[in-house]
Amino acid sequence: MSTDPPQNTPQRQSYSTGTPWEKAVCYSRAVRVGSQVFVSGTTASDEQGQTVAAGDAYQQAVYALKKIEFALSQVGARLCDVVRTRLFVTDISRWDEVGRAHAEFFEGINPAATMVEVSRLVNPDHLVEIEVDAVVGNW
């Protein structure tokens, strides 16, 4: 394993929020390499790692998507650059709540999307976790 962390260069940019999860697991919220952007699984956790909107799948999805939108902006991307989303939910019967939030952010963009039920997320109060991939620029 390399002990030297990758540096931000014209070809690679990383953005971290500094949340406890990112520090504990050593990952970035978003990484851009060239025109590709990858946003890590994002939940409704605030800066201190506390769950936002416990019990409300819709509000958790909205909060996560706002965090994703900001993370994208930090590496020079926008929601309209998103080409794929992955939504992990702990109760698929609440798909419509999460789907409604997704639609509010991605109407007209219509990225490829997958929603799957998982048995649980790292924090049991989290009901949804969202990842996105984006491509920036003219292609």
Where do the PLM segments sit?
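N-terminal presequence-like segments and the immediate start of the first folded domain
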Residues: 1-66, 70-83, 89-139
